[in-house]
């Protein structure tokens, strides 16, 4: 049996302010720092050890990974960062308050933008300062790889090549793998692993800072998955994610 641990970064400053974040590189809030440290402590207490870790190129995920590994005394293990693990790009919504956007466009429309599978938010224009083409961390990307907006379907298509080429082979080799990423990049992976339908994915919310453990067969079929946390706390945190468009 193989094990894989997924972790959404701790609460970010923009999570706290209830803004659409996407590829905007914002840091962790004080609560987010505490969540990351707590996740590391829980993983250590439950006997988890990792051989390798993967994360995005956004500092809220990187910092979460560092805090987890520091708490586990595993700062020395190899860690790899890749843009394909980034959060879904929220296009022209990035930086906007979710509840205020729902008031302006209607809760149903914003829910479609946030949680539907194949409908992206309104796109940026290439001259928008939020467009990642001017960011040096993406200088090696092809023009067609730089998003103006993304649906979850787009995020799945972006994420899965790195999963198949890099992360999944490490798990198959027997390495103990930690992936610290984002709500929607992890939703993309969970959708793939659990064969979640396009219509059901709207109901899947991943809370910040709570480790999600997958037990997998040798051919990477899930046996079961579970959060390392009190079920009531996990349910409450998931509801908070779902309710972000409400005041």
UniProtKB/Swiss-Prot annotation:
Q: Where does substrate bind?
A: 8-15, 21-22, 60, 87-90, 98, 114-115, 183-184
Q: Give a GO molecular function annotation for the protein.
A: phosphoglycerate mutase activity
This enzyme's EC code(s): 5.4.2.11
As its record notes, the protein acts as a catalyst of: (2R)-2-phosphoglycerate = (2R)-3-phosphoglycerate
Keywords on record: Gluconeogenesis, Glycolysis, Isomerase
Which residues are responsible for catalysis? 9, 87
GO BP annotations listed: gluconeogenesis; glycolytic process
**What is the superkingdom listed in this entry's lineage?**
Bacteria
Keyword ATP-binding on entry:
no
Instruction: Specify the pathway.
Output: Carbohydrate degradation; glycolysis; pyruvate from D-glyceraldehyde 3-phosphate: step 3/5
Q: Which residues are annotated as site, described as Transition state stabilizer? A: 182
**Pfam families cross-referenced by the UniProt entry:** His_Phos_1 (PF00300)
Q: Which family does it belong to?
A: Belongs to the phosphoglycerate mutase family. BPG-dependent PGAM subfamily.
**Function description:** Catalyzes the interconversion of 2-phosphoglycerate and 3-phosphoglycerate.
Query: Quaternary form?
Result: Homodimer.
- What's the protein called, per UniProt? 2,3-bisphosphoglycerate-dependent phosphoglycerate mutase
- In the UniProt record, what gene is named as encoding this protein? gpmA
């Amino acid at each position: 049996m193989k094990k894989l641990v997924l972790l959404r970064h701790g609460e970010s400053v923009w999570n706290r302010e209830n803004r659409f974040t996407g590829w905007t590189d914002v840091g962790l809030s004080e609560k987010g720092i505490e969540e990351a440290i707590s996740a590391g402590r829980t993983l250590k207490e439950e006997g988890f050890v990792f051989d390798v870790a993967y994360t995005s190129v956004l500092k809220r995920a990187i910092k979460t990974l560092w805090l987890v590994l520091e708490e586990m005394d595993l700062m020395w293990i190899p860690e790899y960062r890749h843009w394909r693990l980034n959060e879904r790009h929220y296009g022209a919504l990035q930086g906007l308050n979710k509840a205020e956007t729902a008031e302006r466009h209607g809760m149903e429309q914003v829910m479609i933008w946030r949680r539907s599978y194949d409908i992206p938010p309104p796109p940026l224009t290439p001259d928008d300062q939020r467009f990642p083409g001017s960011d040096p961390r993406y200088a090696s990307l092809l023009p067609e790889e730089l998003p103006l907006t993304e649906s979850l379907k787009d995020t799945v298509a972006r994420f899965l090549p790195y999963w198949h080429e890099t992360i999944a082979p490490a798990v198959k080799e027997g390495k103990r793998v930690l992936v610290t990423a984002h709500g929607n990049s992890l939703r993309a992976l969970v959708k793939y692993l659990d064969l979640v339908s396009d219509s059901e994915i709207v109901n899947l919310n991943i809370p910040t800072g709570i480790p999600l453990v997958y037990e997998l067969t040798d051919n990477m079929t899930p046996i079961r998955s579970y959060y390392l946390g009190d079920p009531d706390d996990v349910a409450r945190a998931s509801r908070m994610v779902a309710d972000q468009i409400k005041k």
